[in-house]
């Protein structure tokens, strides 16, 4: 490939769909045969039917009420309007709308960046809400919420409802485990990697004052974007690329050093894939790279509603540049319905790692994040979500946008089919041996 600035390109949002689509198109045109998976699009009808039944159950035909995919819904899990209660509390205290938007961004950034897969056994119990227990993404969301409202993330003694970089850099393992209720009896996947990510987030916030202000707050992103916006009849208009670039530039340093890099600069959630090289017809390093930027995309999706509805109330252009999220619920949906099947060699390799990690009874394959099986799975997941959207819209006779499809359908359907097929764990059909910074 020939691009003027490879680092800039691979960190861009446009690179995600472009690089992964090459893999999807190659597998589709190769009779569904990838290096690690077999893809059978003929089985997509079953996915569509299952997904549409969930939408009908949860929303009836009121499709316009489906919110875009975002962290807001996780923070409100258990039918508790935690976010709205905070907003009401702040408004009642006379806090202006722009500062409310900063506080929401503070909370959402922290909450999203701790949202890598929690594993099958960890739970968070809310003593403040009658000892309700939440697991997985919702548990991590509620844990992050209580750390925020208790002031554990703020260095401002006069305002506990903030996230400050300096405070995050000082977070200890004991404080992390206490905040997330981690113990030998309640283990959380990737604890050390997750804490390091938080500490690195603190460094990023503290060393990027142009974006995060003198306080090193995620919420100062609001003011940075306002400085970049154009005005249209009094409305602040910003392009998704500006939001994206601020997140990528601001948070590049949080990623582990071992990730794919060019000239020593890490690219974030980007990986080398043999299938991509084959699809490109080239063995060159740049032609083998695919990008996902899943946590940044999840963050971007989650920030759009606060940015649009509070404070400066931005109008955000080109939101459709984002892709579906390449994580285990969306990907698991296609695997559990047989649209994707691991090749024999990949399955045996994954099962060997499962057994090496001490589980000799499980038939669930396990892979590390850089394994070609995981990387190809994620590429195909993005392509399949794009393929799925028009099929669902045709059946519903309504034009959902991709973030609505993920929120009401694919992510939820992936979780529900997992619970049906694996009721003991409700876990995904493929396990990731994770450091707490992927998925």
UniProtKB/Swiss-Prot annotation:
Highest taxon listed in the record's lineage: Eukaryota
InterPro entries named in the record: DUF1688
Coiled-coil region: none
Function: Involved in uracil catabolism.
Recorded family membership: Belongs to the URC4/urg3 family.
Name under which the protein is recorded: Uracil catabolism protein 4
Organism name: Lachancea kluyveri
Gene: URC4
